[in-house]
């Protein structure tokens, strides 16, 4: 975070900042060590946006390369495209000189094996995709309640946005996606306007949490558009969360009390440097990092709903 305040390209600083976490094998939300899909394969998504250049780059379903944000940045810098996916993303990363590796760590593999064991014990039809949707997600919540994993890492992601010393606005989002997802599933993180949106002279917004909910509303775009109309970052983020609550009607996504059984968090900054972190569910552990000329600090996200996930 402190690097992003240094006199260099702000987007490059953000990419290098999230790369530190992508390379940490103990981190199960991104990169090396990220939780795999239903078949035990780690597939990564990432996106970056550069406000002054009006450019963006993204990769989706990227396998065997830990630093997805760096690859997304190369897509932005070296191609005319915004998004490269699957085998094309793999071949592009290889051509750029990135090193292949097995991203599935012993920790992530152990969690996947336990999840798979429970799914197979309960599934009526192991070939039915709805098994992964219904039993699979419920078991992930069950494992989090048992303390086997952090519930927030079911949708683990990093979003980092910046306003540079000359007013440059940029952002990056990187993720290993929904834990135990259907192979090939792509969430909001690499999609412009969903997991990340930047508008120079206005602001930036990004998300972590259940990607399908932000995809449905293009929430990051909606937040930045609210900033353009004069909303404060906190108010813009809270309005986006309220829309997600209103649109969550699938019984499989509702708790016994009728509230969403997942979390979504938005991180918002405007051109003046005012920022906010908001979440469906909060608590002292639900925090976001802010770095200014006064140094870095952790702040608690403002929560829309009371209670906890599930």
Locate each region found by the language model.
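Alpha/propeptide regions of enzymes that mature by internal proteolysis
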Residues: 1-310
């Amino acid at each position: 975070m402190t690097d992003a305040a240094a006199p260099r390209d702000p987007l490059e600083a953000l990419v290098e900042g999230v790369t530190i976490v992508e390379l940490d094998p103990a981190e199960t939300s991104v990169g090396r060590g990220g939780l795999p899909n239903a078949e035990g394969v780690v597939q990564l998504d990432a996106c970056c946006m550069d406000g002054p250049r009006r450019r963006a780059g993204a990769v989706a379903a990227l396998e065997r390369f830990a630093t997805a944000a760096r690859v997304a940045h190369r897509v932005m810098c070296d191609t005319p495209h915004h998004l490269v996916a699957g085998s094309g993303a793999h071949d592009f990363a290889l051509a750029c000189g990135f090193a292949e590796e097995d991203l599935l760590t012993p920790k992530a593999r152990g969690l996947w094996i336990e999840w798979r064991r429970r799914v197979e014990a309960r599934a009526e039809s192991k070939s039915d995709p709805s098994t992964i949707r219904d039993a699979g997600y419920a078991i992930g919540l069950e494992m989090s309640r048992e303390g086997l994993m952090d519930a927030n890492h079911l949708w683990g992601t990093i979003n980092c946005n910046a306003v540079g010393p000359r007013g440059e606005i940029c952002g990056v989002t990187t993720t290993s996606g929904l834990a135990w997802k259907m192979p090939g599933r792509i969430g909001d993180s690499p999609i412009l306007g969903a997991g990340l949106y930047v508008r120079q002279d206005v602001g930036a917004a990004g998300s972590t949490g259940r990607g399908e909910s932000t995809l449905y509303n293009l929430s990051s775009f909606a937040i930045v558009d609210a900033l353009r109309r004069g909303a404060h970052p906190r108010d813009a983020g809270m309005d986006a969360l309220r829309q997600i609550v209103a649109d969550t009607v699938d019984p499989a996504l509702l708790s016994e009390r009728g509230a969403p059984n997942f979390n979504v968090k938005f991180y918002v900054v405007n051109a003046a440097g005012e920022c906010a972190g908001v979440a469906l569910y909060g608590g002292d552990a639900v925090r976001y990092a802010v770095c200014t000329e006064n140094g870095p600090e952790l702040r608690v996200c403002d929560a829309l709903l009371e209670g906890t996930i599930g």
